[in-house]
Amino acid sequence: MMITKQSYQKFALMRVFVFSLSAFIFNTTEFVPVALLSDIAKSFEMESATVGLMITAYAWVVSLGSLPLMLLSAKIERKRLLLFLFALFILSHILSALAWNFWVLLLSRMGIAFAHSIFWSITASLVIRVAPRNKKQQALGLLALGSSLAMILGLPLGRIIGQILDWRSTFGVIGGVATLIALLMWKLLPHLPSRNAGTLASVPVLMKRPLLMGIYLLVIMVISGHFTTYSYIEPFIIQISQFSPDITTLMLFVFGLAGVVGSFLFGRLYAKNSRKFIAFAMVLVICPQLLLFVFKNLEWVVFLQIFLWGIGITSLGISLQMRVLQLAPDATDVASAIYSGSYNVGIGSGALFGSIVIHQLGLGYIGFVGGALGLLALFWLRFITIKFKKT
């Protein structure tokens, strides 16, 4: 009996691990253009701010596609659906690696965005389903850890590959790693019938939950602020701070490493007081942005800001997703799809705002604008916390 229990725990953990790897590769490809922005712009003889709109397009495809695509796939068995998504993901990366102009690259990114929109709509609820008993919150933490490792290893390695070879090779390697993960998924995941996915009828039901709607708006606001700055952090560090490319790569590594700390803090502190934890995470996201230009030439201070910022954004993302799942246990996939859509509205809006700031004010101002948007989000958090204190 003991061996059976141990075997169950082992396979359950391996399945959670596969989802963590999947989160790693999806987050790596979503944000790796941030690390390659200058190289892509140079190869197509374009400005970084213009190429940065590729991040906006990707995010808006995800935001518009998350809910309708999730509803269209609501009855499909989840393992089969995941393998289809990885096939689309891999083929799109092959096209990215072969892209002969910016528009072909943009088209390939749209294919990845379609896969992304469904993947993040169903993954949080699935990882909780396959997790060992009494380890549901930790499983969600491991999923977030995979996302954080994308920042620690994925982005810096993507940048290093891009520097040694070229940015096309980075996308090719991502496609290769995704193939290995898909094979693991095929081997390890059990049959996963769709469960509690929700339907189109769930949408108006969820919209009648004011705290849930307030959290979606909070996500859009704070993530818009974050990506106003983060989308252009690589050219900021190189052009404004005037640090070397190697230091820039190291700072991206530190940002991702901080995400591991954020995942750990979530696992330890979120359940004790979720409201205070979310507020604390938001402060860690906002303050480094507001002070980024002020201390732009002090290398150790910028490292510290990047580290605290990384802790904050990882803690915040996983905390808000957990809160959404808690408020919509009857329609987890629909709620997650709307969350993913809201998050990506924030990403797309932030990248667009950052581009506008660069063209109208200059690259040095992105932190001030991003931080100001974050402050508005903090005031909104305070409002919904007071209004729905008992929820």
Curated annotation (Swiss-Prot):
This is Probable sugar efflux transporter. The chain crosses the membrane at residues 16-36, 51-71, 82-102, 110-130, 138-158, 170-190, 210-230, 247-267, 277-297, 300-320, 338-358, 361-381. GO terms for molecular function: carbohydrate transmembrane transporter activity; transmembrane transporter activity. GO terms for biological process: transmembrane transport. It comes from the Bacteria. It comes from Helicobacter pylori (strain ATCC 700392 / 26695) (Campylobacter pylori). Involved in the efflux of sugars. The physiological role may be the reduction of the intracellular concentration of toxic sugars or sugar metabolites. Keywords: Cell inner membrane, Cell membrane, Membrane, Sugar transport, Transmembrane, Transmembrane helix, Transport. One of its GO terms (cellular component) is plasma membrane. HAMAP family: MFS_SotB. It is found in: Cell inner membrane. It is a multi-pass membrane protein. Belongs to the major facilitator superfamily. SotB (TC 2.A.1.2) family. Pfam families: MFS_1. The gene is sotB.
